[in-house]
C-alpha cells in the first residue's frame, strides 16, 4: 500500500534554452509528466538537467530518487534522498521515500526512524504510518505495529478494511488467536466482498483445527477471488484431511497453475501422490522442488524415500548425505542411508550408519526433558500456506489489498475498477499515434486509417506512425533520438514556418518525451496551417487528456488511480478542460467520420464523466465502422456490466476475446 506521491509543479513555461539558461520549472513539470506515465528513464534525464543547472533544488533529487525507486535502483535512490534531505530537512515525503528504500535494503531500524521522522512533520499521514507498519513488521515489533494499526483504524474506521485484516494477522503473530478470530469475523460481517477477509478467517479456523468452518470460508474466498494460490493450497490440506484426494490434488494443481514454482504446492502434491502410490509423479514434483530450492531438506528426504522404493539407491544416498551434512543428528536419515548401502552390498557403510542412528536415538531419549522440537528434526508433513515462517510476510498473508499492483512504491493502482463488484478490471486505454507498436495490441489490417496511411506514404523517410493503445517507456537511446529529432525539426521550422507536417511531427516527438505544453502548441500550429487534419485534432485531444490526468492527480491526493476514477461532468475545476478535448474529438469525427479511434477515445472520456449511455453509443459507432475493434467491444462490455446489463456485457467480452483480447476470457470466468 506504499504508493508514490509526486508533487506537481505546473507553470506555463517552455523547455527550450533561453539566453543560455535552462527553464528548470518546465523541466521539473515535464519530468513529473514522464513519472506519471511510468517513463522513468526519461524522467531521470529531465531531473538530471535540472540538477546540472541548479544543483541546490532539493525537489529534483527527490523526484529523481522516485524514478530510481521505480527502476529498483535503491542505492542510487538512497544517495539522492540523502542529498534532498541535506538541502531541506523539512520534507516529510523525502523521509517516507528513504524509509521505503531502507526497508528494501534490509535496514529496518533506519527505515523505522525515517518513517517516524516523516510522522513528526505530518503526524496523521496514513501512508507514512503504513510505511512504519512495514518496518515494525520486518523487525517483528508486533506490539508497536498493533498500536499504529489501532491509530489508523480509529482515524479512518471502516474506510480501511485491509488495515483491519492486518490487525488480525498481527494479533495472530502475538499468539492471541481468539482476538485474531474476532477481528477477522468482524471484517467478514462488514466487508463480505473481500476475499482476503474470508481467507484470513479460514486460516485462523484451520490453525484452531475447526476444519469444517475453515473449508466453508475457503470456498467463499475462492469464489470471490480465484487467483490466490495459498487459498487453494490450504483448501487442499483440508480436503486431504477428509480423505478427498481427488479434490486435494485438483486444488494443488490449480495453485501451481497460478504459481508455477510454489514450493508448498509442489511438496504437498508430492506427499499425496506418494501416498496413493504414484511414485513417478511424486518424484517429478520433488525433482522440480529441489531444483528450485536445493536447501529444502524435507523435499530431499521425501525424494530419498521414493528413490529407495524405485530401487534408485545411489540417488537416495546422495540426497541423504546432503541431509546428514546439514543435520548431523537426524537419525532417520542414517537409518535410511543404511538401508540403501545394504541394498548396494556396502555392508561396512550400512553398519556404520545403523550404529550412528542407534547412538543418536539413545542420546535423544536420555536428554528428552522437553517436548520442544529437536534442532535436527525435519518437518515432513504437509505445509500450511502462511502458517509458519511465512506468516510474517504480509504481502502473502490474507493479501492486504485486493489490488495486486499496488504493493510497490513505484506501481500505481489499476485503472477503472468497477465499483462494488468482485472483479478487478481496467478498461483498454485510448489510442494514440506512436512510432512504436506492440504487435499483440495492433493488427494493421484491422486498424486502417486512410489519413494515417496517406501521411505515412507521403513521408516515407520520416518515422512511420501507428495507432496504438499500449505505449512503451523510452530507453536512453530512444530519448536521445527524439530530442535530436526535435532539434532537427526545429531547424526546419526556422527555415519554413508554414509547413504543417513539421509541426505535426515535432508535436509527436514532444508527446513522446512527455512535454505536453509544447506538444499542444505544435498541434495547434499544425491545425492553423491545415484545419482539415483529423489526426492533428485527435492528437491534440490526447495530449490534453494526458495533461488533465496529471492535473487531476495533483489535485486529488497525488495518486494516479484518483486521476482515472470517474469524475462529475459538472466539476467546474476541470469542466473547461474536458470541454476542450471533447471538442477536438468532435472536430476530428466531423472531418473524418470513418476515424473510429476518435469515437472510441471520446467514449472513454464520456465513461470517465459518468455519461455511460453516451459512452455505449460511441463504442457502438466505432464498432459499426470497424467490426473487428476488440478494444471497443471490451470497454463497451465493461460499461454494460457496470450498468447491470451483464448478459450484454459478457457477449461483448466474448467478442473481444475472440478478436484477441484474451484477458476478456478471464474476466468472463470471474463473472460467472
Where are these regions (language model features)?
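Register position in tetratricopeptide repeats
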Residues: 36-37, 70, 104, 138-139, ...
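Structural marker of alpha-solenoid helical repeat scaffolds
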Residues: 53, 87, 121, 155-156, ...
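Canonical positions in the second alpha-helix
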Residues: 49-50, 83-84, 117-118, 151-153, ...
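Helix-start (N-cap) detector for alpha-helical repeat units in TPR-like alpha-solenoids
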Residues: 23-25, 58-59, 92-93, 126-127, ...
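Canonical tetratricopeptide repeat
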Residues: 29, 63, 97, 131, ...
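Eukaryotic alpha-helical solenoid repeat scaffolds
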Residues: 309, 325-502, 556-577
Amino acid at each position: 500500500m506504499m504508493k508514490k506521491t509526486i508533487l506537481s509543479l505546473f507553470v506555463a513555461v517552455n523547455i527550450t534554452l533561453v539566453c543560455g539558461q535552462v527553464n528548470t520549472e518546465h523541466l521539473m513539470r515535464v519530468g513529473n509528466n514522464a513519472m506519471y506515465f511510468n517513463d522513468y528513464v526519461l524522467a531521470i534525464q529531465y531531473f538530471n538537467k535540472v540538477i546540472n543547472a541548479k544543483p541546490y533544488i532539493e525537489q529534483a533529487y527527490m523526484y529523481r530518487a522516485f524514478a530510481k525507486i521505480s527502476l529498483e535502483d535503491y542505492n542510487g535512490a538512497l544517495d539522492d534522498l540523502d542529498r534532498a534531505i541535506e538541502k531541506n530537512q523539512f520534507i516529510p515525503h523525502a523521509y517516507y521515500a528513504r524509509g521505503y528504500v531502507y526497508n528494501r535494503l534490509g535496514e529496518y531500524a533506519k527505515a523505522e526512524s525515517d518513517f517516524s521522522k516523516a510522522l513528526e512533520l505530518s503526524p496523521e499521514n496514513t501512508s507514512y504510518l503504513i510505511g512504519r507498519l512495514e518496518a515494525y513488521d520486518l523487525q517483528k515489533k508486533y506490539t508497536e505495529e498493533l498500536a499504529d494499526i489501532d491509530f489508523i483504524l480509529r482515524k479512518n474506521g471502516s474506510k480501511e478494511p485491509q488495515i483491519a485484516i492486518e490487525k488480525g494477522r498481527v494479533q495472530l503473530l502475538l499468539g492471541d488467536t481468539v482476538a485474531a478470530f474476532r477481528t477477522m469475523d468482524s471484517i467478514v460481517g462488514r466487508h463480505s466482498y473481500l476475499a482476503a477477509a474470508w481467507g484470513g478467517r479460514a486460516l485462523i479456523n484451520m490453525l484452531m483445527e475447526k476444519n469444517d468452518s475453515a473449508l466453508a470460508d475457503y470456498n467463499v474466498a475462492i469464489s470471490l477471488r480465484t487467483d490466490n494460490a495459498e487459498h487453494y493450497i490450504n483448501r487442499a490440506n483440508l480436503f486431504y484431511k477428509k480423505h478427498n484426494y481427488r479434490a486435494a490434488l485438483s486444488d494443488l494443481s490449480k495453485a501451481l497453475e497460478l504459481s508455477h514454482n510454489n514450493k508448498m504446492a509442489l511438496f504437498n502434491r508430492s506427499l499425496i501422490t506418494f501416498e496413493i502410490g504414484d511414485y513417478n509423479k511424486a518424484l517429478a514434483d520433488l525433482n522440480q522442488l529441489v531444483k528450485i530450492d536445493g536447501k529444502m531438506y524435507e523435499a530431499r528426504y521425501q525424494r530419498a524415500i521414493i528413490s529407495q522404493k524405485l530401487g534408485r539407491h545411489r540417488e537416495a544416498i546422495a540426497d541423504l548425505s546432503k541431509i546428514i551434512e546439514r543435520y548431523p543428528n537426524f537419525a532417520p536419515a542414517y537409518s535410511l542411508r543404511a538401508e540403501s548401502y545394504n541394498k548396494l552390498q556396502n555392508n561396512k557403510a550400512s553398519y556404520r550408519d545403523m550404529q550412528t542412528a542407534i547412538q543418536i536415538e539413545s542420546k535423544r531419549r536420555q536428554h528428552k526433558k522437553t517436548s520442544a522440537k529437536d534442532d535436527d528434526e525435519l518437518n515432513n508433513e504437509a505445509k500450511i500456506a502462511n502458517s509458519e515462517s511465512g506468516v510474517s510476510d504480509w504481502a502473502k498473508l490474507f493479501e492486504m489489498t485486493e489490488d495486486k499492483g499496488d504493493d510497490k512504491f513505484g506501481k500505481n493502482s489499476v485503472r477503472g475498477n468497477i465499483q462494488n463488484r468482485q472483479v478487478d478490471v481496467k478498461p483498454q486505454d485510448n489510442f494514440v499515434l506512436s512510432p512504436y507498436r506492440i504487435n499483440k495490441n495492433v493488427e494493421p489490417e484491422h486498424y486502417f486509417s486512410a489519413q494515417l496511411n496517406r501521411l505515412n506514404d507521403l513521408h516515407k523517410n520520416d518515422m512511420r506512425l501507428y495507432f496504438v493503445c499500449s505505449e512503451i517507456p523510452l530507453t536512453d537511446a530512444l530519448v536521445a533520438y527524439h530530442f535530436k529529432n526535435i532539434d532537427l525539426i526545429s531547424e526546419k521550422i526556422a527555415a519554413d514556418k508554414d509547413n504543417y507536417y513539421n509541426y505535426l511531427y515535432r508535436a509527436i516527438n514532444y508527446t513522446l518525451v512527455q512535454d505536453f505544453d509544447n506538444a499542444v502548441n505544435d498541434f495547434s500550429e499544425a491545425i492553423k496551417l491545415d484545419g482539415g487534419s483529423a489526426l492533428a485534432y485527435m492528437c491534440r485531444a490526447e495530449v490534453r487528456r494526458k495533461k488533465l490526468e496529471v492535473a487531476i492527480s495533483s489535485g486529488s491526493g497525488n495518486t494516479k488511480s484518483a486521476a482515472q476514477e470517474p469524475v462529475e461532468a459538472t466539476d467546474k475545476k476541470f469542466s473547461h478542460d474536458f470541454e476542450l478535448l471533447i471538442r477536438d474529438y468532435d472536430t476530428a469525427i466531423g472531418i473524418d467520420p470513418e476515424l473510429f479511434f476518435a469515437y472510441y477515445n471520446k467514449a472513454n472520456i464520456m465513461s470517465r464523466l459518468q455519461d455511460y449511455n453516451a459512452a455505449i453509443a460511441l463504442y457502438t459507432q466505432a464498432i459499426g465502422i470497424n467490426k473487428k475493434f476488440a478494444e471497443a467491444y471490451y470497454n463497451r462490455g465493461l460499461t454494460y456490466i457496470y450498468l447491470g446489463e451483464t448478459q450484454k456485457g459478457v457477449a461483448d467480452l466474448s467478442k473481444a476475446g475472440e478478436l484477441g483480447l484474451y484477458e476478456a476470457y478471464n474476466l468472463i470466468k470471474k463473472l460467472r
